[in-house]
Amino acid sequence: TSTELAVEAINDLIRQGMNVSEVSCLACGTSYPDQIMPGQGVMVHGLIPNAPPYEVLTAAGVCVAGMAAMKHAYNAVRTGEHQSSIAVASEAASSIMRGEHFQAEIEQRLLDEAKPEIGFEKDFLRWMLSDGAGAVQLSHQPNQHGLSFKIHWIDLISYANEMPVCMYAGAEIRDEQFVSWKNVTKEEREARSLM
């Protein structure tokens, strides 16, 4: 799962000498969590061995979820609110991009248009998106041993005010209107691969 991948990335930090008791902030980013609620961050926190209570943030979004988590972890330390934080990002896209998940949509499109382009669209995404995770510990001071780096700034800027957003999961634009998965039937969700 995406949660397990994130925890394994954090376990790598632990194996490298990170003490989870010295951390007080955890920021997790993912595009497609394993569950709708609760947030990915608390799911990850619950699986970190011997972790104390943390401030936890879950960042979502397609391409920027991991960097949004990194920015939160960075700001948590930069402002002095926390001495040490963890930023982790994980994705497990393979579980949702399997062909059988799109069979109803393919069949519906064949009926509607007799054009099977959906197969190419979904295959493209399946091969472009991969599973993986990475984690980093941020601290108010450099490491005593080993590699350290300093973050000078992180800018996350949206241009959704100028360009249409893309890569929906759980929604689509239909006839120039936003349609949420919550407002359609189960059959329509399957026929349009909204989830």
Which positions does each model-derived feature cover?
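Conserved catalytic cysteine-centered active-site region
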Residues: T3-E4, S31-Q83
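Short, flexible helix-coil linker/hinge segments at the edges of structured domains or between repeats
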Residues: I96-G119
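Condensing-enzyme catalytic core mediating Claisen C-C bond formation in acyl metabolism
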Residues: T1, K115-M195
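Glycine/charged-rich beta-loop-alpha catalytic/anionic-binding loops adjacent to active sites
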Residues: E22-C25, I48-A59, K115-F120
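Phosphate/pyrophosphate-binding loops at sites that engage ATP/ADP/AMP, CoA/4′-phosphopantetheine
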Residues: A9-S24
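Short beta-strand segments
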Residues: G29, A60, S85-E91, L138
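Acyl-CoA/ACP chain-elongation machinery
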Residues: E81-Q103, Y159-M167
